[in-house]
């Protein structure tokens, strides 16, 4: 299995393409100049395309991924109804979901043979919409509205329209600011990082009909931390044993272990990292974590080690200006 790491740097309007080897070393293979400030990225389920959101002309761009080395070639683009903050797809590769923090909406763009062809639905009134996350069963779209302390729940119809579920939302504690999410591999639990109080909520998916309950909330900061809380990203290892979340003010990654059933998180430690870590990701083997520093203009690679999943730095690399998004593709 070969792995390619993509780093989006909006200030220099670039995507850096890296090969990740078995020892955790990165080799730069391509630098793509993007027509706009590139931020969120996601790989299509069939691994043929990389979708990226750009501003100030709000669009989703599709880049064809070379199967041998992961190199990118521009393929198509489609307009968006707001500045793209987060981008994702359904598991079948039929739709792209884009959350827009500034516009307060989530949009659905239809894909034809992997290429974006146009918006089929937009839901407004999601103040501070920060991500759109499809459930493992491909039925429910979880959409955190950060400024409203709620996660809205939509059923995705066959033609890509979003239908509010009943109940239509779950709420966090006041002032939490739900932001990004991941799901446990067993499909029974979801984890949401809250930006404004730097906590992580564990949500139990009791059934496929929207019966959801918050079963744990954990503070992700050190006990003596008294500065402004400003959490950003969250990811889980493929085996579901280790979960990580980052805070930009403290420039650290919090390490959690996950109980076997996914219901309980335990804080294991903290890893100082690049300055203002806006985004990070984990490779497909669950062996390495790559973090980007929005203010350091570098990325660091860490090896995930031991039962606790602690991080040991393997290397550091210069990228573009203001790197914000990290995606890893296996091919």
Curated annotation (Swiss-Prot):
One of its GO terms (molecular function) is 6-phosphogluconolactonase activity. GO terms for biological process: glucose metabolic process; pentose-phosphate shunt, oxidative branch. Keywords: Acetylation, Carbohydrate metabolism, Glucose metabolism, Hydrolase. InterPro entries: 6-phosphogluconolactonase_YbhE, Cycloisomerase_2, Lactonase_7-beta_prop, N2O_reductase_N, WD40/YVTN_repeat-like_dom_sf. Its EC number is 3.1.1.31. Pfam families: Lactonase. The keyword Heme does not apply. It is an enzyme of class 3 (hydrolase). The modification N6-acetyllysine is found at residue 287. It catalyses: 6-phospho-D-glucono-1,5-lactone + H2O = 6-phospho-D-gluconate + H(+). GO terms for cellular component: cytosol. Catalyzes the hydrolysis of 6-phosphogluconolactone to 6-phosphogluconate. PANTHER family: 6-PHOSPHOGLUCONOLACTONASE (PTHR30344:SF1), 6-PHOSPHOGLUCONOLACTONASE-RELATED (PTHR30344). Belongs to the cycloisomerase 2 family. This is 6-phosphogluconolactonase. It comes from Escherichia coli O157:H7.
């Amino acid at each position: 299995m070969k792995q390619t790491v993509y780093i989006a740097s909006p200030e220099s309007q670039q995507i850096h393409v890296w090969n990740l080897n078995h020892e955790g070393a990165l080799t730069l293979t391509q630098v793509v100049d993007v027509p706009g400030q590139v931020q969120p990225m996601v790989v299509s389920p069939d691994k043929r395309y990389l979708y990226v959101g750009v501003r100030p002309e709000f669009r989703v761009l599709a880049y064809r991924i070379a199967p041998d080395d992961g190199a990118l070639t521009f393929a198509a683009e489609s307009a968006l109804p707001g500045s793209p903050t987060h981008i994702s797809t359904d598991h079948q590769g039929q739709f792209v979901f884009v959350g827009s923090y500034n516009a307060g909406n989530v949009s659905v763009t239809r894909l034809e043979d992997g290429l974006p062809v146009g918006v089929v639905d937009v839901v407004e009134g999601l103040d501070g919409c920060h991500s759109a996350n499809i459930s493992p069963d491909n039925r429910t779209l979880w959409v955190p509205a950060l400024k409203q302390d709620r996660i809205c729940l939509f059923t995705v119809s066959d033609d890509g329209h979003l239908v509010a579920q009943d109940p239509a939302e779950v709420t966090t504690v006041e002032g939490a600011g739900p932001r990004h999410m991941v799901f446990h591999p067993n499909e029974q639990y979801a984890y949401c990082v809250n930006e404004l109080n730097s906590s992580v909520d564990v949500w139990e998916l009791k059934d496929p009909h929207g019966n959801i309950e918050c079963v744990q909330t954990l503070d992700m900061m050190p006990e003596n931390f008294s500065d402004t809380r400003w959490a950003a990203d969250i990811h889980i290892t493929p085996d579901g044993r280790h979960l990580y979340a980052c805070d930009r003010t403290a420039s650290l990654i919090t390490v959690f272990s996950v109980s076997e059933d996914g219901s309980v998180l335990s804080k294991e430690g903290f890893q100082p990292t690049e300055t203002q870590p806006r985004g990070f990701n984990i490779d497909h083997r669950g062996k390495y974590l790559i973090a980007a520093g929005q203010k350091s203009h570098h990325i660091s690679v860490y090896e995930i080690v031991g039962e606790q999943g602690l991080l040991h730095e393997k290397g550091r690399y210069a990228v573009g200006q203001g790197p914000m998004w990290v995606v890893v593709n296996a091919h």
